[in-house]
Amino acid sequence: MAKEFGRPQRVAQEMQKEIAIILQREIKDPRLGMMTTVSGVEMSRDLAYAKVYVTFLNDKDEDAVKAGIKALQEASGFIRSLLGKAMRLRIVPELTFFYDNSLVEGMRMSNLVTNVVKHDEERRVNPDDSKED
């Protein structure tokens, strides 16, 4: 029977919570003025590397997103040291931050589906109008 929820997944889940707390309370970088959310963490099998996926409250501005990711990368050593104290791991993983655009893509897809459904309902209500298109 295979492990469904192994150690890397458990460590990643706990690390996600701890990094979110650290970003909220400890990081005072002005480039991170927008609210930062940790949407996920992926751990390597040997727990030496972690990919941290983040989203920002005001993610419409690409320059602000790039500046935010750069600020997180520059603060990764500090975040790592705080993470080591909070989690008491033998090896604190090397952190790499990525912007998670899945939320934005999900909203875009939801809007597309909503528009199609609305258009379909309009065609059902007014079948004569659709023949003119």
Swiss-Prot record:
Gene Ontology molecular function terms on file: ribosomal small subunit binding
**Database matches in InterPro entries:** KH_dom-like_a/b, RbfA, RbfA_dom_sf, Ribosome-bd_factorA_CS
Instruction: Spell out the SUPFAM superfamilies in the cross-references.
Output: Ribosome-binding factor A, RbfA (SSF89919)
Determine if Magnesium is one of this entry's keywords. no
**Where does this one sit in the cell?**
Cytoplasm
Q: Which residues form a coiled coil?
A: none
| Keywords for the protein's UniProt record, in alphabetical order | Cytoplasm, Ribosome biogenesis
Q: Give the GO terms filed under biological process for this record.
A: maturation of SSU-rRNA
Q: Which GO terms describe its cellular component?
A: cytosol
Which positions form S-S bridges?
none
Subunit details: Monomer. Binds 30S ribosomal subunits, but not 50S ribosomal subunits or 70S ribosomes.
Its biological purpose: One of several proteins that assist in the late maturation steps of the functional core of the 30S ribosomal subunit. Associates with free 30S ribosomal subunits (but not with 30S subunits that are part of 70S ribosomes or polysomes). Required for efficient processing of 16S rRNA. May interact with the 5'-terminal helix region of 16S rRNA.
Concerning its family, UniProt says: Belongs to the RbfA family.
Which protein, by its recorded name, is this? Ribosome-binding factor A
List the lineage, top down.
Bacteria, Pseudomonadati, Pseudomonadota, Gammaproteobacteria, Enterobacterales
Name the encoding gene, please. Answer: rbfA
